[in-house]
Amino acid sequence: MEMRADLLIVGAGMVGSALALALQDSGLEVLLLDGSPMSVKPFDGAAPFEPRVSALSAASQRILERLGVWDGIANRRSSPYTDMHVWDGSGTGQIHFSAASVHADVLGHIVENRVVQDALLDRLHDCDLGMLANARLEQMRRSGDDWLLTLADGRTLRAPLVIAADGANSAVRRLTGIATREWDYMHHAIVTSVRSSKPHQMTAWQRFTDNGPLAFLPLERDGQQDWCSIVWSTTPSEAERLMALDDEAFCRELERAFEGRLGTVLSADPRLCVPLRQRHAKRYVAEGLALIGDAAHTIHPLAGQGVNLGFLDAAVLAEVLLQAAERGERLADVKVLSRYERRRMPHNLALMAAMEGFERLFQADPLPVRWLRNAGLKLVEKMPEAKALFVREALGLTGDLPALAKA
């Protein structure tokens, strides 16, 4: 049997789910499909932290509030942070960013991805939106003015407009032949949660080591500030060595690499190790097709901005589609969809380039580069206006914001 919709969203992760919610009152027949069961786990506040977290910006918080999702996150578990401290492990340069410098309450919230996902799914289940679970895409081709999708179980779906929100290894992007520019950082990231003897002080800490950045991101449980999510970017060989250590030895290595800023590392949860690659689609749209989130771009986890870019993608695309619908335009028209690409691609590319340059700068080892790097950090630390600009960018409140992200 063939199913039909006005718009198919492939991928019910955080970004795809947000887009579906943003379109819930559009009058369009929206169908959200995913290869997972799309079920919500009962939340256990005493359970260990999930290893994968996101640093949600103020813009993302506004979007999630307006979609009716933020309370579901706050009622589970989220950790606000007010400050960020960055320093160069090869010198004396350091810089401190504060929410107070721009009269904000917080810089953002560290939230487990599973918490965000479950809050979104809870909201989706409360809405009158079509959802198709355990739906794995196998084939996709043009059929007249529509896309015809075939699932692994043989079912077929038809729609004039398909949104790819199916992640970094997007099947939609592959099946429709959209090329990407991608490169391997030759680094792996070790992620886990650790408990320290000193409180994190609602501060995100980041040290640049000779092998890559090491971040301690604050987590909070029952008002206690002694847990952090860590993201340790290093060479593949060093990552392999660190992953082979027992928990006690790993904690001691982590403590040394972090210069004991948070005292003794008391314990560590199970570790994950993931290779770091950056991808960017050469185009975000085609006739009847748009890419959002990691399907369009993946960036270095250095700034924790990946999902924030994705939420802005979803909010802008929803805005473009709703405005086009009001004008009576054909939503699948590539000219309509290109409005989304024009608004999002330059911003995403600029942030990706900045993160790439920052990462390369701190990996450069020659003495003159290290001297300039430290001098630059010290200089910016003495320039409150420059630091405030960085903070506003981190809050996600600059550039061409969609209505969902505006105050």
Kindly give the residue locations of the regions a language model identified.
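Conserved N-terminal helical subregion
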Residues: 2-3, 73-175, 183-188
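N-terminal Rossmann-like FAD-binding beta1-loop-alpha1 element of flavoenzymes
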Residues: 5-32
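Conserved Rossmann-like nucleotide-cofactor binding loop
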Residues: 15, 38, 169
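Glycine-rich FAD pyrophosphate-binding loop
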Residues: 24-50
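N-terminal FAD cofactor-binding segment of flavoenzymes
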Residues: 48-89
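Conserved FAD-binding catalytic core of PHBH/FMO-like flavoproteins
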Residues: 64, 146-148, 162-264, 268-271
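FAD/FMN-dependent oxidoreductases across multiple families
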Residues: 238-332
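C-terminal helical "tail/cap" subdomain of flavin- and related membrane-associated enzymes
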Residues: 319-407
